[in-house]
Amino acid sequence: MNTSITARELFDQQRDKLALRWVAGPKGEHREIQANSNNARRPSLAGYLNVIYPNKVQILGTEELAWLDSLDARQRWETIEKIIQVQPLALAISKNQSCPEDLRAAADESNTPLWISSKRGHELLNHLSYHLARTLAPRVTLHGVFMEIYSIGVLITGEAGSGKSELALELLSRGHRLVADDAPEFTQIAPDVLDGTCPELLQDLLEVRGLGVLNVRDMFGDTAVKKNKYLRLIVHLTRPMTEPTPSGYERLTGDSGSRHVLDLDVPLITLPVMPGRNLAVLTEAATRLHILRTKGIDPAAMFIARHSNLLERRTP
């Protein structure tokens, strides 16, 4: 999914938190940053003023403004020209410092957004860098029910009618929490982290066939819903046409594998849906098994090792 953010959107999202004022270049509100993970040489999203390797948001603190003041007239004009020519998303001055008139005029003439904040430079840098990195991170929407089970994020998937929503309802009644139904959105906020959230339209809602749309917060209380969770496991429900006949190895290890989501391989456990199976208990067990495996505890491997040792002892 291609993502972007404009200067106006960034300003509106951070105005209150960073006490921002827009003092010049109002016509540049449509300038935007496009997410482009394939461009290894793209500029940094936010940073202190850098003329050689410019940032998309250039922050001017006390030292940066003092450096500008130390330049002679020609050098100062050339430096401001360089700052403007690369078309940054915005310029941000920290600590409510007064804006130099020549910089303000250049920003107005070039339609470069110029903001002033009461925050210190490092606060601007931290907040803007984090917000931009998260906003522009790769993201994808997957079909399924995303829940918190035993404190880890579990995505329940399966074809239509496989019982995902009914399973989610049973898990809710057992004390687990809903993050998103039907269309959870996952953002890769770090090389090994997928953060799952719920679209605003579907917040707190769960659709169950025969019952319609349920408000989970109203039915089960505030603790039954979760704003976001990291995706750690996928449980896939499948309806086999015939009784499955797993091999001996599958009977030991279960039907496990992985699913590629963005740049990560997420562990996946497949559960056959058949009459009489308690899917809620099986899903809880699958989650506990995954937690054990992350700690290096694998019951199947332990059994195979015991079996091998027993055969070795009995071999003459």
Swiss-Prot record:
Role this protein plays: Catalyzes the ATP- as well as the pyrophosphate-dependent phosphorylation of a specific serine residue in HPr, a phosphocarrier protein of the phosphoenolpyruvate-dependent sugar phosphotransferase system (PTS). HprK/P also catalyzes the pyrophosphate-producing, inorganic phosphate-dependent dephosphorylation (phosphorolysis) of seryl-phosphorylated HPr (P-Ser-HPr).
Annotated stretches, region: Important for the catalytic mechanism of both phosphorylation and dephosphorylation: 206-215
This protein's UniProt keywords: ATP-binding, Kinase, Magnesium, Metal-binding, Multifunctional enzyme, Nucleotide-binding, Serine/threonine-protein kinase, Transferase
Molecular-function annotations in GO: ATP binding; magnesium ion binding; phosphorelay sensor kinase activity; protein serine/threonine kinase activity; protein serine/threonine/tyrosine kinase activity
CDD domains hit by this protein: HprK_C (cd01918)
A Pfam family matched in the record: Hpr_kinase_N
Further comment: Both phosphorylation and phosphorolysis are carried out by the same active site and suggest a common mechanism for both reactions.
EC number: 2.7.11.-, 2.7.4.-
Protein name: HPr kinase/phosphorylase
Family: Belongs to the HPrK/P family.
Record's comment describing the protein's domains: The Walker A ATP-binding motif also binds Pi and PPi.
Protein origin, superkingdom: Bacteria
Source lineage: Bacteria, Pseudomonadati, Pseudomonadota, Gammaproteobacteria, Lysobacterales
